[in-house]
Amino acid sequence: MQEKSIRLGIVVAEFNYDITQLMLQKALSHARFLNVEVKVVIKVPGTFDMPLAIKKLLEKDFIDAVVTLGAVIKGETKHDELVASQTARKIVDLSTEFNKPVTLGIIGHGATHEQAVERIEEYATRAVEAAIKLVQRTRKLDELKEIKETVIIE
């Protein structure tokens, strides 16, 4: 039986564009390399603005998972902590509400600009890989009926 294709949506923040645009390029390239289709890329002003776009994508039947890409850079106040924690919390809530994976490819909080630049490829590719693995594994979990012994889903 041929495995069903995986269709991703990507939400990318425009704030810290020099970083997030490179993250988007890396994510798209990695998805192509892994033979996964990116159906929609939506840009939002900042990381804090992601939840509505994520929700809209999760409502679509042609989206199996959403990858988020952003960079929350440390400033002189604790604003970065607020943005990162509130966004991450809402991302988790949306994932469980819609029963679809939403992966966290957001650099920060507390990262300097230099640290964020160093993490561009790692965060972008890991977010894509996590989305793919979660879709594959939750599909396997959905196929389980009655079981009599421990099942490990990889």
UniProtKB/Swiss-Prot annotation:
Q: Which reaction does it catalyse?
A: (2S)-2-hydroxy-3-oxobutyl phosphate + 5-amino-6-(D-ribitylamino)uracil = 6,7-dimethyl-8-(1-D-ribityl)lumazine + phosphate + 2 H2O + H(+)
| GO molecular function (one) | 6,7-dimethyl-8-ribityllumazine synthase activity
CDD domains (alphabetical) = Lumazine_synthase_archaeal
What Pfam families has UniProt attached to this entry? DMRL_synthase
Give the EC class as a word.
transferase
Question: Which superkingdom does the taxonomy of this entry point to?
Answer: Archaea
- Write out the catalytic residues in the record: H79
Q: So where does (2S)-2-hydroxy-3-oxobutyl phosphate get bound?
A: E76, T77, R119
| TM segment ranges | none
For this protein, the Enzyme Commission number is: 2.5.1.78
Q: Name one GO biological process term.
A: riboflavin biosynthetic process
Q: Which residues bind 5-amino-6-(D-ribitylamino)uracil?
A: F15, T47, F48, D49, A71, V72, I73, L104
Its annotated function is as follows: Catalyzes the formation of 6,7-dimethyl-8-ribityllumazine by condensation of 5-amino-6-(D-ribitylamino)uracil with 3,4-dihydroxy-2-butanone 4-phosphate. This is the penultimate step in the biosynthesis of riboflavin.
* Name under which the protein is recorded: 6,7-dimethyl-8-ribityllumazine synthase
The coding gene here is: ribH
